[in-house]
């Protein structure tokens, strides 16, 4: 009996040792767009720059997406918006369509009238609270997106500001009231991460992702 117990422990410890650690990937590791493309597959050129780890949308360049697809992941990033600016990070995408972590100047952009369009909201679906810990325009915010199975979370500066489960009755109700309602399976696709060009200057840095 002891012999089999020892064999079991050796097997279990061997599997534990062989387990691969979760890899965190820097989506701008080389300080360039080698991991990115435009939505239409073209090379990222005018409109977007990256320098010293800071990604800047400064003029018309179109949305850009990762070459790799993701579904279950944790994404952390810093973001900074211009005065009266609008942008976002989309995930579980198809083309330019997908769930969106809204990036907005809540004070001066006209989209602030809709609570689900304000900063850190799950755009069109779940509003971030008015009491969220957002920085002044021009300062860096820390964002975090968790997409694991049906669980969706948005974080802002260390505080969870959005939480919903895909496919629940609450989700279905919000989805049917949104502009996405005709897109079957929306929110449950595997797809690239997208940085949105919404015609306003925006900055990102420290964009790190790990599959979970």
Where are these regions (language model features)?
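Sec-dependent N-terminal signal peptides
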Residues: 3-12
């Amino acid at each position: 009996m002891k012999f089999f117990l020892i064999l079991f422990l050796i097997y279990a410890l061997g599997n534990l040792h062989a387990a691969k650690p979760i890899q965190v990937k820097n989506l701008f590791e080389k300080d360039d767009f080698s991991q990115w493309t435009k939505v239409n597959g073209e090379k990222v050129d005018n409109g977007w720059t990256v320098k010293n780890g800071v990604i800047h949308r400064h003029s018309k360049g179109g949305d850009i997406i990762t070459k790799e697809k993701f579904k279950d992941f944790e994404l952390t990033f810093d973001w900074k918006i211009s005065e009266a600016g609008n942008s976002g990070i989309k995930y579980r995408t198809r083309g330019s369509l997908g769930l969106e972590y809204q990036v907005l100047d809540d004070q001066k952009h006209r989209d602030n009238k809709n609570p689900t369009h304000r900063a850190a909201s799950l755009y069109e679906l779940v509003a971030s609270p008015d009491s969220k810990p957002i920085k002044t325009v021009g300062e860096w915010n820390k964002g975090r997106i968790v997409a694991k199975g049906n669980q969706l979370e948005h974080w802002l500066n260390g505080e969870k500001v959005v939480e919903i489960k895909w496919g629940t009755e609450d989700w279905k109700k919000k989805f049917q009231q949104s502009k996405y309602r005709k897109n079957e399976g929306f929110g449950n696709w595997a797809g690239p991460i997208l940085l949105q060009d919404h015609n306003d200057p925006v900055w990102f840095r420290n964009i790190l992702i790990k599959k979970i």
